[in-house]
From Swiss-Prot:
Alphabetized GO MF terms: sodium channel activity
Domain of life, per lineage: Bacteria
Protein name in UniProt: Sodium-type polar flagellar protein MotX
GO biological process, one term: bacterial-type flagellum organization
Sel1-like repeat boundaries on the chain: 72-107, 108-143, 144-179
GO terms under cellular component: plasma membrane
Source species of the chain: Vibrio parahaemolyticus serotype O3:K6 (strain RIMD 2210633)
Pfam families named among the record's database cross-references: Sel1 (PF08238)
Membrane topology classification: Peripheral membrane protein
Record localization: Cell inner membrane
Originating gene: motX
Length: 211
């Protein structure tokens, strides 16, 4: 009887140890990102890195929020995952579809990225004119990268001179602690100033309350 009791105790101890080891191997459950947290990751271009760092544990949650609830930040994340084959089977066309959905819902990061893709010919055929509306919309919503990229394209004679005033005003009212971006903005502003009448430059500086 004693031998049976000892054997049973040993089996229980071994089972508990195995469970603890398995839990340690898997790691603690990863909480789903809040929309605010995800948007910040996207703005820092760290969203795919974060998904990889979380060992792809949140794929089902991400897919559900993108395809069933249609949350724009999650549509963008899922689209980017598909486009680059991160934690899911690569499907560039479907990835761009979800990124476009996020852009249509007004997510600035999605608008900026699609505009950048068209401008540089990433995943899609290069079309700088097609990039302009995406970048312009993102710039109007405060996306700094879009503001810089839009001004660069305008100074290379893409888009319309009618956009100079808005592009200048957005740069003039942009705030950044990044010294390289700060200098780049100053260079782009000077370039636009050379193409604009002084009264339009003055008006762009005054209308800082209109976005």
């Amino acid at each position: 009887m004693k031998l049976r009791t000892v054997a049973a105790s040993l089996l229980l101890m071994l089972s508990a140890t195995t469970v603890r080891a398995s839990a340690a191997d898997v790691g603690a459950p990863v909480p789903i990102y809040t929309e605010a947290e995800l948007i910040k990751l996207i703005e820092q271009n760290k969203h795919l890195q974060r998904v990889r760092a979380d060992n792809c544990q949140l794929v089902e949650d991400i897919v559900a929020r993108a395809t069933r609830i249609n949350l724009p930040a999650y549509e963008f994340l899922y689209g980017d995952m598909l486009a680059w084959g991160v934690c899911v089977e690569q499907d560039v066309e479907l990835g761009l579809y979800y990124m476009e959905n996020a852009a249509q819902q007004g997510l600035p990061a999605a608008l900026e990225q699609i505009g950048r893709y068209y401008s540089r010919g990433t995943l899609v055929q290069q079309d700088k004119e097609r990039a302009i509306p995406y970048l312009r919309e993102a710039a109007s919503m405060g996306n700094l990268n879009a503001r810089i990229h839009l001004a660069e394209l305008l100074l290379r004679d893409y888009g319309s001179p009618l956009d100079y005033e808005d592009a200048y005003r957005w740069l003039y009212n942009s705030v950044t602690a990044d010294q390289r971006q700060h200098k780049r903005i100053a260079v782009l502003r000077r370039g636009l100033e050379q193409r604009m009448p002084q009264n339009i430059v003055a008006r762009a500086k005054r209308r800082d309350m209109f976005w």
